Amino acid sequence: MKLVIAEKPSVAMALASVIGARTRKDGYVEGNGYLVSWCVGHLVGLCDASEYDEKYKKWRYEDLPIVPECWKHRVLEGTKKQFGILKKLMRDSKVDEVICATDAGREGELIFRLVYEQAGCKKPMKRLWISSMEEQAIKDGFASLKDGSCYDSLYQSALCRAKADWLVGINASRLFSVLYNQNLKVGRVQTPTLAMIVDRNQKIKEFTKEKYYMAHIKFDEMDAVTEHFQKKEDADRVAADCMERMCEVEKDDVKEKTVRPPKLYDLTTLQREANRMFGYTAQQTLDAVQEMYEQKLVTYPRTDSQYLTDEMGESTETLIQMLLGKMPYAEGLEYQPDVSKVLNSKKVSDHHAIIPTMEVAKADIGKLKERNRKILYLISARVLTATAAPYIYESHKCQITCNYHTFYLSAKKTKQEGFKTIEKKLKQFFGIIAEKEEPELDIWAGKHYGPCDSFVSEHFTQPPKQYTEDTLLSAMERAGNEELTEDTEKKGLGTPATRAAIIEKLIQSGFVKREKKNLVPTDDGNVLITVLPDEIKSPKMTAEWEMALNHIAQNTETADEFLNGITELMQELVARYQGISEEKKEQFQGKAKGEVIGKCPRCGADVREGKVNFSCSDRNCAFTLWKNDKFLASQGKKMDKTTAKKFLSKGKIHYKDLVSRKTGRQYEATVEMVDPGEGNVQFNLIFPQR
């Protein structure tokens, strides 16, 4: 028999239904010569420092750097049952082959391989690599399985990423926490991302507004302006000279310009667009598109390609015809698609661009969640715009003279709407007001206009804008390679698959907060970046590391070279920072400590309230209760101060008004806090005996 291991139960069930495994067992499905089981995300992870040596339970400078000679892994808390099921299935004598069917990417490869290794499995391994959950795509994937060894370099890249995160997180966090006597959390990718947000915020704070004035003349719905004046009286004089006067277009620099259609979406460009249009966070967009991928409505989401493979031309034409009839904003739209614009196998690595599948044709789109529906409309519209004609217009840069004063006017004249027609229809459908563009005007050199109205406007120079998720994702993608072109080798902070989680972690850790659409550093975030060295917070260096991980996946760089470089950096930091000046330590003095709300059940130290959690004050202890706890939220409750105090004092709380996730009805139960002694706190439901 063949054992198929997916990344999550829902994917496993979808695969099982296609390959004929339909008999449900405990933790797997059986049938037609297959056993189909699943992980639940990561089941196995790297051991904590204290699992290498008990002395590492205490954070001490003299123990640094901590660099394992032989890396150890362990089964993660809360996943032991499913790991046990997989281990038993792998060792079953009936199983002669194991098929890795986790997500077709770096992290999916790691999830499976760590389970395979931890279980001590030596059986032949195959890899299922698909970009769609459609039935035919699954059948084709199982018909063309590759040997697992073909993905060894991808596994090494994933393993290096995990080890690098461990080395930087463990050593840098301990080093600077000990030096400053504060619990400072440092992350390999998280910290440089925070540094960009802090740097932008600092530039805004340091910006000094400067006032300036412009004189205007208005004629025939046209508005021409002067250059900037520092003094209002100078602008007033020009406006007075031109009131009721005639003007002449002295120069008209006309250029025909062509704007090519946008490319198809990769994950980052989709997240950016959804943030611009709907205000969705990167994580919300990823969750929506992942859910629709599992519903077979769109292709694999965690891609960095904006093209399709050359052989997808015919199927793309069929897809477009379906979308024209299915999408409500496409009603009455007529255009000749040119699919050759989106085909380029050389620019597709692991997965092609995100597009809808033909399953959309029979789907009831109206029954989708609102967010999913909007994202599906975006993805579908991008297929249409990407294959549409270019937008062509005449650009007019006019120099206008009025009573010996010079004014300037920019205008345009559209010659071909092209893909803009589809974009306008989509925005009208969503009720989005189009951005202000240059006016469409009939104007040419030598023509006289007037008499003119004139006035003066007051303006201020503008500071840089705070990052939104849209602009931060762009900055993360370009980090270390600001002059990014289509053919440039990509570096960047994180990957399309991880950037959303990085942003969310910064917010959950209390380093960044959302202010409407903006991402703004907190006081803790500002202070952390102030004291860390450039090597740790440099986006460019971290981007170089990300590129090195890509090289490992491509088998052009070795894992040892990469990890040796990280280790040397940690050794250098520990040697350089043996002490901290009193001046720098004072940056942490006087910081308000959160209110003590109880005692830690793990170590007995005080538990204090923070911005996003209630955590143990002993930095050697990781006990934390999160204010946005997902379990309590799923039951209609919050982890507020009163709730946290009750859990710490009694260990459980009895509720009469919990809310069922399935039915929405209220029910009665006791929520018991279960502390495993390490890792995350868990909660159990105890129902009253009837």
Question: Which positions does each model-derived feature cover?
Answer:
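Intrinsically disordered, low-complexity regulatory segments
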Residues: 1-162, 166, 462-463
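Secretory-pathway/luminal and periplasmic proteins that interact with or process carbohydrate-rich
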Residues: 295-301
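Metal- or metallocofactor-binding catalytic centers and their adjacent structured scaffolds
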Residues: 232-265, 271
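C-terminal or mid-to-C-terminal helical accessory/interaction module adjacent to the motor/catalytic core
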Residues: 93, 135-219, 254-258
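Amphipathic alpha-helical transducer elements in NTP-driven molecular machines
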Residues: 9-16, 33-36, 40, 76-87, ...
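Conserved short loop/turn motifs at secondary-structure junctions
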Residues: 1-3, 101-104, 181-183, 254-263, ...
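Basic, low-complexity terminal or inter-domain segments flanking catalytic cores
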Residues: 2-3, 79, 90, 118, ...
